[in-house]
């Protein structure tokens, strides 16, 4: 149809569709709950668009009626997706775990409010357990769930970091107030900073409705101004003491800035953690080796070199500091599996190549197991290349292929031969490991 002669109703519907399309990324990425302000805003916009679509006059014309129907269906699809994101069972699971963390903070964070820095083992263990459970919430690669899990995890990890930083400091300071008149003021500021830690944690966890990030930021900035105004008369030990307290305040201000920017930035980005960076560097090299192996025309000559380097990567992962952080533990666990499955792929390929070079008489059941191992080798090559989620056709196909191999192994009768029994057992374990790896790959981990 000539754009110049396009019916006004069609033009209006196209305009509404453009507006709906523009808001789609916000709907797809919505990671909150149905009582969030942003949920209500998106719901209101989409509902308004539906009313706008409904009010377009079709004049009884079929093409306009079809265009209006398509526009309404697209808008209704986004409304449904918004509702599903907010009410997804795993989103509710994330929120329930976060509520447990809130209850723990309310119950155990009193020492911070009183100006001390005594945190019970029960609190530390509770936070560790909560973070670990969050890392195991399945997202199925869904953007909204990954975002919700990431946001919740990083908030709680920030709380853990604030607490651990406070616990490990234990300086020889504060100084005696007899040393210099300024020391009394620095000591009182340090007490205020300890209290501010408790307030910050309560803010991060959403358990203090009487305080705001902005107000606490002003209070902390005021404390820095008070410290800057002190005359320390060139006394090195007092100047160092003041510097330590200022550094503590600046750390707390950093968390406040991140919390205020949380909706628009990668707040508390665990990806900047030095242990995570080490893990990422290992994974980067592992992917390079994997691509080289999967693309090689004649890979056998690469096997030994690749396997030696991969075993070295496992050694590097063993040296990564976990820092008592379950997120780092989970990241390392996944990285170890990624490297180990590639070593398994190489071992299997090598074994199959050797069998071709040195054929021998085999018991029929044993031969059947080897044929299945050959199938598993091909499937594992595909799984290593797979990068989708559980809804992908390729995921379903690979899962079905692996299940068929397990059924085929179950049907093999070793006829009492021990060697065949052991081979079948090993093949079953391999198929199960590939299935587990496929499951892990489809639930992409984010820091």
From Swiss-Prot:
Q: Which GO terms describe its biological process?
A: Golgi organization; negative regulation of neuron projection development; negative regulation of oxidative stress-induced intrinsic apoptotic signaling pathway; negative regulation of proteasomal ubiquitin-dependent protein catabolic process; negative regulation of protein refolding; negative regulation of protein ubiquitination; protein stabilization; regulation of inclusion body assembly
- Might you report a single GO cellular component term? mitochondrion
Q: Which UniProt keywords apply?
A: Chaperone, Repeat
Q: What GO molecular function annotation could you give as one example from this UniProt entry? A: ubiquitin ligase inhibitor activity
Kindly state the subunit structure of this protein. Answer: Binds to the ATPase domain of HSP/HSP70 chaperones. Binds PRKN. Interacts with HSPA8. Interacts with JPH2.
Q: Which organism is it from?
A: Mus musculus (Mouse)
Official protein name in the record: BAG family molecular chaperone regulator 5
User: Looking at the keywords, is Chaperone present?
Assistant: yes
Protein function: Co-chaperone for HSP/HSP70 proteins. It functions as a nucleotide-exchange factor promoting the release of ADP from HSP70, thereby activating HSP70-mediated protein refolding. Has an essential role in maintaining proteostasis at junctional membrane complexes (JMC), where it may function as a scaffold between the HSPA8 chaperone and JMC proteins enabling correct, HSPA8-dependent JMC protein folding. Inhibits both auto-ubiquitination of PRKN and ubiquitination of target proteins by PRKN.
Tell me where in this chain the BAG domain is found. 9-86, 95-167, 182-260, 275-350, 365-442
Q: Does the keyword Chaperone apply?
A: yes
Q: Which InterPro entries match?
A: BAG_chaperone_regulator, BAG_dom_sf, BAG_domain
Entry comment, domain topic: The fifth BAG domain is responsible for the interaction with HSP70 nucleotide-binding domain.
């Amino acid at each position: 149809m000539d754009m110049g002669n396009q019916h006004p109703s069609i033009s209006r519907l196209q305009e509404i569709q453009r507006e709906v399309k523009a808001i789609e990324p916000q709907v797809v990425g919505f990671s909150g709950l149905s009582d969030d302000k942003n949920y209500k805003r998106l719901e209101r916009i989409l509902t308004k668009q539906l009313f706008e679509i409904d009010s377009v006059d079709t004049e009884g014309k079929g093409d306009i009626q079809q265009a209006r129907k398509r526009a309404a269906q697209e808008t209704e699809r986004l409304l449904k997706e918004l509702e599903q994101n907010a009410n997804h069972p795993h989103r509710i699971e994330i929120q329930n775990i976060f509520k447990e963390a809130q209850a723990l903070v309310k119950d155990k964070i009193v020492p911070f409010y009183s100006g001390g820095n005594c945190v019970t083992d029960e609190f530390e263990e509770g936070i560790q357990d909560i973070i670990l459970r969050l890392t195991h919430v399945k997202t199925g690669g869904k953007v909204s769930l990954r975002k919700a899990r990431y946001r919740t995890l990083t908030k709680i990890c920030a709380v853990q970091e604030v607490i651990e930083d406070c616990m490990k400091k234990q300086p020889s300071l504060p100084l005696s107030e007899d040393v210099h008149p300024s020391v009394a003021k620095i000591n009182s500021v340090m007490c205020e900073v300890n209290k501010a830690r408790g307030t910050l944690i309560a803010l991060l966890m959403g358990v203090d409705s009487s305080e705001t990030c902005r107000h606490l930021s002003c209070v902390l900035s005021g404390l820095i101004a008070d410290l800057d105004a002190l005359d320390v008369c060139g006394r090195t030990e007092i100047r160092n003491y003041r510097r330590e307290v200022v550094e503590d305040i600046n750390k707390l201000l950093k968390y406040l800035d991140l919390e205020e920017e949380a909706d628009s930035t990668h707040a508390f980005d665990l990806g900047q953690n030095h242990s995570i960076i080490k893990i990422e560097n290992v994974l980067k090299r592992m992917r390079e080796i994997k691509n080289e192996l999967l693309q090689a025309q004649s890979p056998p000559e690469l096997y030994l070199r690749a396997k030696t380097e991969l075993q070295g990567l496992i050694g590097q992962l063993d040296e990564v500091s976990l820092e008592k952080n379950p997120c780092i533990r989970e990241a390392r666990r996944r990285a170890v599996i990624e490297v180990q499955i590639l070593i398994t792929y190489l071992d299997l390929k090598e074994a199959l190549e050797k069998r071709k070079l040195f054929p021998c008489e085999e018991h029929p059941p044993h031969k059947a197991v080897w044929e299945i191992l050959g199938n598993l080798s091909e499937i594992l090559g595909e799984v290593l290349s797979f990068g989708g989620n559980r809804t992908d056709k390729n995921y379903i196909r690979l899962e079905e292929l692996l299940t068929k191999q397990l059924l085929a192994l179950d049907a093999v009768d070793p006829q009492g031969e021990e060697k065949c029994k052991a081979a079948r057992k090993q093949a079953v374990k391999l198929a199960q490991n590939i299935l587990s790896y496929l499951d892990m790959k489809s639930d992409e981990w984010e820091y």
